Amino acid sequence: MAILRAKEIRGMSDKELDKQLKDLRNDLLKQHAISATGGAPENPGRIRELRRTIARILTIKQEKKQKEMKR
């Protein structure tokens, strides 16, 4: 899964964001499990990338929610 940029995330619907968030969280869980069992991850930067992408999605969802509340 590629890195999602803020522009791409803003173009997604709420359902797409929820699905993407669920997929990323599952992937992060798998990566943590691999490192916790002592295995070497294929890409050590992947965990950081996943955490940042999840944070981007949550931030943009919150921005959209606040915009709707102001209307």
UniProtKB/Swiss-Prot annotation:
GO terms for biological process: translation. GO terms for cellular component: cytosolic large ribosomal subunit. It comes from the Archaea. GO terms for molecular function: structural constituent of ribosome. Signal peptide: none annotated. The keyword rRNA-binding does not apply. Keywords: Ribonucleoprotein, Ribosomal protein. Pfam families: Ribosomal_L29 (PF00831). Belongs to the universal ribosomal protein uL29 family. This is Large ribosomal subunit protein uL29. It comes from Methanocella arvoryzae (strain DSM 22066 / NBRC 105507 / MRE50). The gene is rpl29.
